[in-house]
Amino acid sequence: MSLVFDEYGNPFIVIRDQQAKERLRGIEAHRSHILAAKTISNIMKSSLGPKGMDKMMVSQDGEVLVTNDGATILENMQVDNQIAKLMVQLSKSQDDEIGDGTTGVVVLAGSLLEQAEQLIEKGIHPCRIYEGYETACKIATEHLKTISDSIEFSKDNIEPLIKTAMTCLGSKIVNRFHRQMSEIAVKAVISVADLERKDVNLENIKLEGKEGGKLEDTQLVKGIIIDKGISHPQMPKIIKDAKICLLTCPFEPPKPKTKNSIEITKAEDFKVLGEIEQKYFTDMVEKVKATGANLVICQWGFDDEANHLLLQNNLPAVRWVGGLDLEKIAMATGGRIVARFEDVSADKLGRAGLVREVGFGTTQDRYLSIEDCPNTNAVTIFVRGGNKMIVEEAKRSIHDALCVTRNLIRDNRVIYGGGSSEISCGLKISAMADDIASIEQYAVRAFADALDAIPLALAENSGLPSIESLSTVKAMQIKEKNPRLGIDCNHRDTNDMKAQHVFDTLPGKTQQFLLANQVVKMILKIDDIIKMGPGADE
């Protein structure tokens, strides 16, 4: 325990270090949290690149998840160590900001900490290490700008965007159809993008999936798809020139907010009550029909009596539609959501050229497709696959491609993949380290060595001799002064990533370096770990 003495010489306890707490200090603390971070990094390393392996996650209730997405893997891992949780948050930050590169940022952070551990063992203070890392990171991010290229695209020329999205999908489960999936993702983003303002709202793109069919059956719908069907089997399944009434209020008589009861003593009274309720339903249906609506979409359900009245009045309806779906339908059709039935009017109706119910094979599954909407800024990517697991992974993959395309519209600069940018930055940092006279030179060189972890992992995952491949590409970059040379993961007999059309976005790679460096700095500044134990509050 830690004791201090007051002005009278009496001792008192500041921190009780016995059974109540577990404590690590100094170099032991650094070793502990560097080991935790390296463990997470090593788990993720085999998932990096186009030949990266998938991970199977099995939850406590037996639900199986197979994925290659770094953020998803870490999100579903049961991590108890607090430093390991920082690595999970690191991947999530990359996913939230960029949408791609979630595996690479964790591998890079683990490599930086591994190099830092070697410097700490040599007696270099962690403060000097992360100061050197800051210097090296600044050199790397500036060098990325010098080796980047700008790509030109327009609504009529989306091929450069498609090729960049294909790089993102190369390691995913959809890689056999990555050309088709990239085209779908790019066309979806272009549909909702304002190219003049370089603004993209991905919330206007809905990702919907249904198991059954093949991955290549995935399609882009210029409209909204909802996982619901028409409420009655005898109602029309195809509505042309649809005028849609959107309701968030229940399609039923209002219920009093206070406690009440009705006493019925005669059969005639019960009959009158039923007639009043039926009249209320009839008035509601007539009020909707009077607006000119020929389709009702309701957030809440309605009973069979209301459903039968709707059928009699030839008014198709859809019930139990989620609030978010209702908002997207309103945005696409130009309609306004009605919260009180008294407010139903013709000017609040949404419009669509075609609304149709589509079924799947021999199953009872159905979905509603709302197409030819006035607002073309709302689209749906409808994903198909052999089972739910494939559909969900395909949706995650397409989401990454959407994010990459959005980033390119915001900033059209790209750097080349295959580890070429890391190798080029490593060479630049090593050259600049010669001009640093202080002890930080060791940390700067360590940063350059840490960058080699990315091309080494790419080569190893592709079945290539990792060290030999890295050495060869480094020598070629120095000899030819060509920063586009990287690891030939796809075995195409050329190391020129421009010729292979392997691209990364400049903002994505820059963010990787900055986030990894920030987390490493945070971890290196921790020199004392205090864990509360049982009985600590006694």
From Swiss-Prot:
* UniProt keywords, alphabetically: ATP-binding, Chaperone, Cytoplasm, Nucleotide-binding
Q: Which Pfam families match?
A: Cpn60_TCP1 (PF00118)
User: Which biological process annotations from GO are given for this protein?
Assistant: protein folding
Recorded hits in InterPro entries, A to Z, give: Chap_CCT_epsi (IPR012718), Chaperone_TCP-1 (IPR017998), Chaperonin_TCP-1_CS (IPR002194), Cpn60/GroEL/TCP-1 (IPR002423), GroEL-like_apical_dom_sf (IPR027409), GROEL-like_equatorial_sf (IPR027413), TCP-1-like_intermed_sf (IPR027410), TCP-1_chaperonin (IPR053374)
For this UniProt entry, the molecular function terms from Gene Ontology, in alphabetical order, are:
ATP binding; ATP hydrolysis activity; ATP-dependent protein folding chaperone; unfolded protein binding
Q: What is its main location?
A: cytoplasm
Q: Where in the cell is it found?
A: Cytoplasm
Q: Name one GO cellular component term.
A: chaperonin-containing T-complex
Q: Which family does it belong to?
A: Belongs to the TCP-1 chaperonin family.
Assembly state and interactors?
A: Heterooligomeric complex of about 850 to 900 kDa that forms two stacked rings, 12 to 16 nm in diameter.
Query: Its biological function?
Result: Molecular chaperone; assists the folding of proteins upon ATP hydrolysis. Known to play a role, in vitro, in the folding of actin and tubulin.
Q: What is this protein called?
A: T-complex protein 1 subunit epsilon
Organism this protein belongs to: Dictyostelium discoideum
